[in-house]
Amino acid sequence: MSLLDYFKSKKKPSTAVMAKERLQIIVAHQRGQRDTPDYFPQMKQEIIAVIRKYVQISDDQVSVQLDQNDANLSVLELNVTLPDR
């Protein structure tokens, strides 16, 4: 195998492989959201409303996630991208 063959052999992954990877990411994301409580969407909107009292932000600047590690532990993660002053 020559040095040129080594560089030529690298090919882009097929579209089927890329589609499969994307689908796996989407399914994993949806599985994570499946176990969220019923009150979670309303709680998220109320948190955004409180933040808007002090800072002008849009919905896409706020990320709220609920991670349930086990039956006794839940973690509410809130990420807010604040505008520049």
UniProtKB/Swiss-Prot annotation:
GO terms for biological process: cell division; regulation of division septum assembly. InterPro entries: MinE, MinE_sf. It comes from the Bacteria. The keyword Cell cycle applies. It holds the Pfam family MinE. The keyword Ribosomal protein does not apply. Keywords: Cell cycle, Cell division. NCBIfam families: minE, PRK00296.1. Prevents the cell division inhibition by proteins MinC and MinD at internal division sites while permitting inhibition at polar sites. This ensures cell division at the proper site by restricting the formation of a division septum at the midpoint of the long axis of the cell. Belongs to the MinE family. This is Cell division topological specificity factor.
